[in-house]
Amino acid sequence: PKYTPAEVRNDPYGFTYKEMSEVIGENEAKALYEELYKQLPRKKNLSMLVKNICKSSDTEKYVYELKDNKYIETVFIKRRDGGTVCVSTQVGCPVGCIFCESGRNGFVRNLTSSEIVQQIILLRRKVNRIVFMGMGEPLFNYDNLIKAIHILRDRYGLNFPTDGITTVSYTHLTLPTK
């Protein structure tokens, strides 16, 4: 296996069930996944903390503090049938769109797959749509984004349906010059 048992136990939200079972065995992986996804999350398994929540009638903005004291935001949009969560994939953003606050301080780092998944876990809400469009440019963190989607879709964990996951990316346009 390419991971150690300590890596799996220290950051379990960063691994699919298959990866876990290859490293720590099927029985322990099954028990750990049950603890992670079928019960309320326990602080010992989380690498980020909720620092602030701003609520309005139909939206909630969460500010999370990461282990390296950096901050990211996640937005939950309430709907009659559950909710949509807008998830960050980076700390800061390298694109610098003029309409976006995230890029004003520049790019700091990519989020790990675990940090992406934990944004959804920490909401403790019924989420039926995930949009990767919070802080950062999702496709600039492609490997961790794809791994997070695999973890979210894992049938032993959240078993999130594919049709409820969307990414939003910028399009680079070259405008004609005069």
Task: Please give the residue ranges for each predicted region.
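Conserved, mostly hydrophobic/aromatic
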Residues: T167
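Canonical Radical SAM [4Fe-4S] cluster-binding loop centered on the CxxxCxxC motif
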Residues: K78-E115, L122
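Internal gly/pro-rich beta-alpha loop/helix module
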Residues: F140, R153
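Flexible, acidic/Gly-rich N-terminal and inter-domain linker regions that tether
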Residues: P1-G83
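Short helix-terminating capping/connector loops at secondary-structure junctions
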Residues: R125, L158-D163
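Active-site glycine-rich loop that binds ribose-phosphate moieties when present
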Residues: E115-L122, K147-L152
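Conserved small/polar residues in nucleotide/adenosyl-binding loops
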Residues: T171-T177
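Short Fe-S-cluster ligation motifs
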Residues: I121-M135
